[in-house]
Amino acid sequence: STKKAVPEAKAALNQMKLEIANELGLSNYESVDKGNLTARQNGYVGGYMTKKLVEMAERQMSGK
């Protein structure tokens, strides 16, 4: 499902996606037609974003 569990987090998640794309060398990711990117490029952004979100949750759960 594409429905967000916390709709209020949408802006923060979009900002995180743009920051990660920049880190991965995909400048102007916001204005690029994602259909023109390879599945690998789009997958890197989503995969790295998921990794960062899991790390954040683990830190929060451990109290660090």
UniProtKB/Swiss-Prot annotation:
SASP are bound to spore DNA. They are double-stranded DNA-binding proteins that cause DNA to change to an a-like conformation. They protect the DNA backbone from chemical and enzymatic cleavage and are thus involved in dormant spore's high resistance to UV light. GO terms for biological process: DNA topological change; sporulation resulting in formation of a cellular spore. Gene3D superfamilies: Small, acid-soluble spore protein, alpha/beta type-like. Transmembrane segments: none annotated. The record marks E19, I20 as: Cleavage. It comes from the Bacteria. SASP are degraded in the first minutes of spore germination and provide amino acids for both new protein synthesis and metabolism. Belongs to the alpha/beta-type SASP family. GO terms for molecular function: double-stranded DNA binding. PANTHER family: SMALL, ACID-SOLUBLE SPORE PROTEIN A. Keywords: DNA-binding, Sporulation. This is Small, acid-soluble spore protein beta.
